[in-house]
Amino acid sequence: MPTLTKLYSMEEAATHNKQDDCWVVIDGKVYDVSSYMDEHPGGDDVLLAVAGKDATDDFEDAGHSKDARELMEKYFIGELDESSLPEIPELKIYKKDQPQDSVQKLFDLTKQYWVVPVSIITISVAVSVLFSRKT
């Protein structure tokens, strides 16, 4: 017969964040590590830092041994109710400008930059032609 697992919300787990009442969430499982605080090899500060939070990344980053993972089962009290997790908004992906658009924009800007030098050269040539005819 399958055993029923109690579900806890993330909000409920978050209220258990003290030295004498410390829960951590790892891989969607909730652990009451209150009685383990003094025994933890990294000290109680490590557990308090992640108390009432999802500590999955911190747990994995620490590189826990197989024995540590087996010891966790002793403190298992239930699972995280995934419906209690806040929804992550969907990311909108915007397409970058196509290379043709970028080239076209550059070409358009180039026209603007050449207007002044070309105008100066044209006026200079016209003035020099006019003065050379008069003399």
Swiss-Prot record:
Main localisation: plastid
SMART domains, per the entry: Cyt-b5
Signal peptide (UniProt feature, chain positions): none
Domain Cytochrome b5 heme-binding intervals: 5-81
Residue numbers binding heme: H40, H64
Membrane-traversing stretches: 113-132
InterPro entries assigned: Cyt_B5-like_heme/steroid-bd, Cyt_B5-like_heme/steroid_sf, Cyt_B5_heme-BS, Cytochrome_b5
Localization in the cell: Plastid, Chloroplast membrane; Mitochondrion membrane
Family matches, as PANTHER family: CYTOCHROME B5 (PTHR19359), CYTOCHROME B5 HEME-BINDING DOMAIN-CONTAINING PROTEIN (PTHR19359:SF25)
Family: Belongs to the cytochrome b5 family.
Protein name as it appears in the record: Cytochrome b5 isoform A
Species: Arabidopsis thaliana (Mouse-ear cress)
Organism taxonomic ancestry: Eukaryota, Viridiplantae, Streptophyta, Embryophyta, Tracheophyta
